[in-house]
């Protein structure tokens, strides 16, 4: 226990420090870069300190809970806390954001605003995962929108305004359902309004209302996850955004949807979740295959990786829909694993673009000998993405399959069909990833005289590569590093709300 407001500090520190960026000396970008990187490092060290000193692996309850009165009318409090669902994603947020800040160093146009927006995203993401108030959860959810929109529209590619507008329309439009659901849950009942997750977990709703609430929240999460057919904003966004922004999107932003499904839909609306769980599994299986096939047809490198992300998030839907301990833990592991792998792939694509000045696979070829270090790391991360044994993706997908097999909520025929469909997606994954590597690095060199003006990865880029690769290997060989964080909490959710384990 601690009376010190640790969580409030880690939520407010990045955005508060970002407000000081305009006061820094205007002597090039060096001071701004190091200042922002220093803030990110301090934040990540604080998160690590909190994890090491105040998080207990066998505790299923909220720890370090902070509750400060904010708006009395709606019982709107500044409520924060950590548990097994949130701590892993908070650590992932700190890790990926720090590396994304380092990856953004080549940005030279208006770096003050760029780094401030990244720090604002940092606060919003940590705040969302630490929120214990449903309206505060919505507030942090919305805090992401403007920074991403500006990062995309100001530092994106040729079609950046189209992609940014599409992003804001999809995400802001779906957020209306999140707000309506949050207010309805908070105001429902005769015992007065409450927005506290702990109190909401003890409330019951008429099944019709619970289904409506579930669907409202689900629409918001389906856009962020993203879920087919609400996914079309993601390839456009990734295709136009700077690769440091892509790292934040793939590494953290998509995980907000999966986290919301577990935190609110599964934990607070368990009866409705039991009804819709088979549909989550079906949609997840279809998404895996559809996105894999679509990825195979993409000539743009970043769009191919984006569709790969959509495909991999289909496994998260299947794991959450399985309503089993091993399946839900597998979904959480998949979110963290993909957060690392997705960020790594987009960084690899970005540094490759910095050298070739093209993202189109049919304009590359034979560049492996010119950039062997980038080739090695790009290939390694692609192997992780196709779930090679010994790397993090393999364990997560295996657990999700075991979750479906062990579930008592589905018929044998249903399980067989889902496994066959999902396995088809797994077969397609190495096809589109290996063909991507072949088109980029092997064959005839299309870009002439590449070696005369291109250098391989430098110290900064190699450092980012190594920092991303070690956790992928570590989780692959010892997945208990992540599973021990969420196991107790997931077990309490399943045993308390669902009959099948």
Curated annotation (Swiss-Prot):
Pfam family, one: Proton_antipo_M
Domain of life: Eukaryota
Record's GO cellular component terms: chloroplast thylakoid membrane
EC number: 7.1.1.-
UniProt KW Ribosomal protein keyword: no
Presence of the UniProt keyword Nucleus in the record: no
GO biological process: ATP synthesis coupled electron transport; electron transport coupled proton transport
Transmembrane segments: 4-24, 37-57, 87-107, 113-130, 134-154, 167-187, 207-227, 242-262, 274-294, 310-330, 331-351, 364-384, 385-405, 416-436, 462-482
Single GO molecular function: NADH dehydrogenase (ubiquinone) activity
Keywords per UniProt: Chloroplast, Membrane, NAD, NADP, Plastid, Plastoquinone, Quinone, Thylakoid, Translocase, Transmembrane, Transmembrane helix
Catalytic activity: a plastoquinone + NADH + (n+1) H(+)(in) = a plastoquinol + NAD(+) + n H(+)(out); a plastoquinone + NADPH + (n+1) H(+)(in) = a plastoquinol + NADP(+) + n H(+)(out)
Localization, UniProt: Plastid, Chloroplast thylakoid membrane
Top EC class, one word: translocase
InterPro entries, sorted: NADH_Q_OxRdtase_chain4, NADH_Q_OxRdtase_chainM/4, NADH_UbQ_OxRdtase, ND/Mrp_TM
Bilayer topology annotation: Multi-pass membrane protein
Family statement drawn from the similarity comment of this UniProt entry: Belongs to the complex I subunit 4 family.
Record's protein name: NAD(P)H-quinone oxidoreductase chain 4, chloroplastic
Species name: Anthoceros angustus
